[in-house]
Amino acid sequence: MTAHDVSADIEAVVEDTELPRRLKDEVYSTIEERGVGVDDADRIAKAVETRYLDTRVDPLDPVGTVSAQSIGEPGTQMTMNTFHYAGVAEIDVTQGLPRLIELVDARKTPDTPMMTVHLDEEYATDRERAHEVVWKIEATRILALGDISTNVADMLVEIDLNEDTLLERWPTVNDTDAIAEEIAETIESNLGVSTRQAGTLIEFGPEEPSYRDLLQLVEELREIVFKGIEEITRVVIRKEETDNGEEFVLYTEGSDFGEVLDIEGVDASRTTCNNIHEIYRELGVEAARETLINETMNTLEEQGLDDVNVRHLMLVADIMTNEGTIESIGRHGISGSKDSVLARAAFEVTVNHLLDAAIHGEVDELDGVTENVIVGKPIKLGTGDVNLRMGTTQD
């Protein structure tokens, strides 16, 4: 019995088709919505079944070649612009062909890493609460907190902290002296110096009076992260319309997926980043595969190429994640690890592959497309893998 409110005759008609359960449920929903009879239900079910069977891949169909054509041809129309104004103020992200190459090459770090951070309900609708999360994520360095000066006469670095900025960046602390003390302790632990603090003024210097050492301390001071995540240099907050209504969404320059997910107020179920390897490390290969598909599809859609069937992208993502890790499509990944000597040699560094194969006594079984084309044999796809036997008798 189905959960849908249809007659037994209609259920028998639909269940008699070769449709998968998801499509059967959609047929039931359509029949319920339109209130059709058995005859119309039969016609609907058979029409859907016909379309479904037509879309299935035929035996020996070269799905890899079709996917390569379906992605490669639109790729010729993509722009070479590395940066694109992605609808978010002041956040540049790699788009177009450079981004597509990044994805199929499975680069460890994107040219412009970024994250889209969604917030929990109590933070998503309150700008002040959302800013609390911003300051926990964005790397806060000394130049954002006050003025730095050097006292050459006394060989000291002097930091004059801005009280308003301190209270803004540490919204849960009301005492600026306590914040300044925390900053002084961070300086001591990172630079190995002794500090003197008076209110929001902090002083320190090198152990031995040296102008060179003084300037070196200033340079090292600029790199210290006093709050937030070091890899994330900037966060932009934006109010957007989502499935849950209007809410504040954060966009970051730089990414550290694991660290951000641990921050209070971040909705881990909806937060994403454009670094496939970070998602793989935190959530596993299935999440990485899904992100690979979504990122590739979004890249094509940004260029107006949204007519590429997602199944071609799914096939590429499946191949890249088939071994449980993320492999690139190239000589250091899938193409370079094929069993066929000729297929490897045809891709890149031909002489090296042939020499290595000869040294190790490798044998090419000529099972794939490339190697059969090279030696002039019919490829084992389509009619090339169908054998006819004439005059045989069947027992």
UniProtKB/Swiss-Prot annotation:
Presence of keyword Transferase: yes
Keywords, comma-separated and alphabetical: Cytoplasm, DNA-binding, DNA-directed RNA polymerase, Nucleotidyltransferase, Transcription, Transferase
Domain of life: Archaea
Gene3D superfamilies hit by this protein: 1.10.150.390
Pfam families listed in its UniProt record: RNA_pol_Rpb1_5
Enzyme class, first EC level, given as a word: transferase
Recorded GO MF terms: DNA binding; DNA-directed RNA polymerase activity
Main location: cytoplasm
Gene Ontology CC, one term: DNA-directed RNA polymerase complex
Keyword Nucleotidyltransferase: yes
Cysteine disulfide links: none
Catalytic activity field: RNA(n) + a ribonucleoside 5'-triphosphate = RNA(n+1) + diphosphate
A GO biological-process term: DNA-templated transcription
InterPro entries for the chain: DNA-dir_RpoC_beta_prime, RNA_pol_Rpb1_5, RPO1C
EC nos: 2.7.7.6
Subcellular location: Cytoplasm
Role: DNA-dependent RNA polymerase (RNAP) catalyzes the transcription of DNA into RNA using the four ribonucleoside triphosphates as substrates. Forms part of the jaw domain.
HAMAP family: RNApol_arch_Rpo1C
Quaternary context: Part of the RNA polymerase complex.
Family recorded in the similarity comment: Belongs to the RNA polymerase beta' chain family.
Protein name: DNA-directed RNA polymerase subunit Rpo1C
Organism this protein belongs to: Haloarcula marismortui (strain ATCC 43049 / DSM 3752 / JCM 8966 / VKM B-1809)
Gene: rpo1C
